[in-house]
Amino acid sequence: MAILYYDEKKLFQLNTENTTYVIGLSPEGYVGHVYYGPLLHGEPDLYPLRMDEPPFTPSVNKREKSSFLDRFPMEYPTGGVGDYRESCLNIRNAQGRMGCEIFFDSYEIFKGKRPLTGLPASFGTEDEVETLEITCKDPVLDLVVVLSYSVFTKENVITRSVRVKNEGSEALKVEKIYSACLDMDNEDFEILSLHGSWGRERHIQQGALRYGKQLVSSGKGESSHQEHPFVALVTPGTDQERGEVYAMHFVYSGNFIGQVERCQFDTVRMV
């Protein structure tokens, strides 16, 4: 199986032929990113989440919420709850308050990949792809957020998407929604993107990953030849034969933002 769940450890393991992606659940129900890299042989563990490490001072981590959330490696961060890095989902309620906090509710693993209604998307047979859907809920807003991960084993690709549903009686405004997030420790990464113009698309641009935010985007209603909807983190000296590359690429895009943020703890968030 490409996707495994370890109930005792509260871990999901997604395997392609050469890579492993691991998702873990904190005791509070936050969905966290544990690992993405070369294929793991055997069960993973939760310790990379570092949930009990002191966030700022050499004292016991008492789970003070704002300091905990501002360093926890989220799978899908939301705005207005204490994680001050870039969020993937911002919701405003009918009273004008902005905030959304989602917790794990349930999961489903199945063969194949469901289509994205109204959008072009990757596809595959039940023999080619396996999908994990993690359902999260905000109990205050009655909001459901479904995180979808489809594993194309032979291609070493994991595709991601998100669905949001308002199950309450109050109107909610979606101010921002991104497809995915990847939180990682910094490994002296450089940022790589593709720029161009008419007749000379897809030129490689690579440089230092600075503290703060760096992004590529298009507001033209299409992905554009000026900025391609692609961003990657690469280790120094990477070329087509060696090095580590962690990349995100839209299958299709109108307006888009691809952003990388290096934070105070020297971790990296890519959305």
Describe the function of each predicted region.
Residues M1-D7:
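Terminal leader/tail segments of proteins
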Residues K10-Q13, E17, V31-V271:
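Polysaccharide-binding surfaces and accessory modules of carbohydrate-active proteins
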